[in-house]
């Protein structure tokens, strides 16, 4: 008996690495030293920093993977994986430098996993982030046929004096929401439960989605905000704080960029609620409170700016093709979002 008979095909693993090698290397920045295949990846710290601070983040895609696997559509979740990590790192004002991925599967399917990696590569290009390395683990008996799981890891850099940690946020600051591209990568256990309870398939096209299927809309990749945010930070805009709206929605994530004595007064009618959220709420009879505490509800990223820069900030992002909304202001409090009391 050998390893292949036990379910692990080492040769297929080597062939897979060769298959993706050129695409991975297409993401490499000048700071990348060496190529794939070593025990570690090497990245030279960029020049021009007086007191560089490294910022790290890690995340996954959650049960959205079940949808991708069910529809045999694997490219977009690779983009999701990068987005979830780089957007987190971005909230500190950091520029993403490099990314690593961990991919585990029951049986190596080179075509399937190549699609995933192609998505990761695209996400890295969108965030100007080098795919420095990764791990592909074949684990027979642990995952079912066609199943895989993903984890991502990102490291970014920011000048220490420019680090955003919430301390700059002031009472009276304006809260600007940047539109999400859809459900992004959180809340899919509830999404799947709603669709299952309704006895629907992912091919179902609700009228409110105007001809698009549930699967098509739900697999829309998470918006990557790196380029517009880094450009904003390099402009004359003064950004005091930022938040990535992920699991737990606005109520859980927005307070993470505030000081202990601050809250936000939110106007929930100030931005567009995407049709997919309206459908989920109606089909699943989900309360407004549960919706806002589970999903991003159309706001994927938040920037906090001085109130006298609110209009300039709105115009700046809208001109960049990112829908922006003035959705509230920072007030005295203890982190509770006033206005979302459903």
Curated annotation (Swiss-Prot):
Domain of life according to the entry: Bacteria
EC numbers, comma separated: 6.3.3.1
Catalytic reaction(s) noted: 2-formamido-N(1)-(5-O-phospho-beta-D-ribosyl)acetamidine + ATP = 5-amino-1-(5-phospho-beta-D-ribosyl)imidazole + ADP + phosphate + H(+)
GO molecular function per UniProt: ATP binding; phosphoribosylamine-glycine ligase activity; phosphoribosylformylglycinamidine cyclo-ligase activity
Listed pathway(s): Purine metabolism; IMP biosynthesis via de novo pathway; 5-amino-1-(5-phospho-D-ribosyl)imidazole from N(2)-formyl-N(1)-(5-phospho-D-ribosyl)glycinamide: step 2/2
A GO CC term assigned to this protein in UniProt: cytosol
Any one of the GO BP annotations: 'de novo' IMP biosynthetic process
Assigned keywords, A-Z: ATP-binding, Cytoplasm, Ligase, Nucleotide-binding, Purine biosynthesis
Subcellular localization(s) per the UniProt record: Cytoplasm
One Pfam entry name: AIRS
Record's protein name: Phosphoribosylformylglycinamidine cyclo-ligase
UniProt gene name: purM
């Amino acid at each position: 008996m050998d390893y292949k008979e036990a379910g692990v095909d080492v040769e297929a693993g080597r062939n897979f690495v060769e298959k993706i090698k050129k695409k991975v290397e297409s993401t490499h920045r000048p700071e990348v030293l060496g190529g794939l295949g070593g025990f570690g990846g090497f990245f030279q710290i960029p020049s021009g920093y007086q007191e560089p601070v490294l910022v790290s983040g890690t995340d996954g895609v959650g049960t959205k993977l079940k949808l991708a696997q069910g529809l045999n559509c694997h490219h977009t979740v690779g983009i999701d994986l990068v987005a979830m990590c780089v957007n987190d790192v971005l909230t500190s004002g950091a520029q993403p430098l490099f990314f690593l991925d961990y991919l585990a599967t029951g049986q190596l399917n080179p075509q399937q996993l190549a699609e995933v990696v192609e998505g990761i590569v695209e996400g890295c290009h969108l965030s100007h982030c080098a795919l420095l390395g990764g791990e592909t683990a074949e684990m027979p008996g642990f995952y079912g046929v066609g199943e895989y799981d993903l984890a991502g890891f990102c490291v970014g850099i920011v000048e220490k004096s420019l680090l955003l940690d919430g301390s700059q946020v002031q009472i009276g600051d304006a809260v600007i929401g940047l539109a999400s591209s859809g459900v992004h990568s959180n809340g899919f256990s509830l999404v799947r439960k709603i669709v299952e309870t309704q006895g629907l398939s992912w091919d179902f096209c609700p009228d409110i989605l105007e001809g698009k299927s549930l699967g098509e809309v739900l697999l829309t990749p998470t918006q990557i905000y790196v380029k517009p945010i880094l450009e904003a930070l390099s402009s004359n805009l003064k950004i005091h704080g930022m938040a990535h709206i992920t699991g737990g929605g606005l109520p859980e994530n927005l307070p993470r960029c505030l000081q202990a004595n601050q809250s936000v007064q939110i106007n929930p009618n100030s931005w567009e609620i995407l049709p997919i959220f309206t459908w989920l709420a109606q089909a699943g009879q989900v309360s407004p409170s549960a919706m806002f505490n589970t999903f991003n509800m159309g706001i994927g990223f938040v920037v906090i700016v001085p109130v006298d820069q609110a209009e300039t900030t709105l115009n700046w992002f809208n001109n960049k093709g990112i829908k922006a909304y003035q959705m509230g202001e920072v007030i005295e409090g203890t982190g509770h979002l006033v206005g979302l009391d459903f």
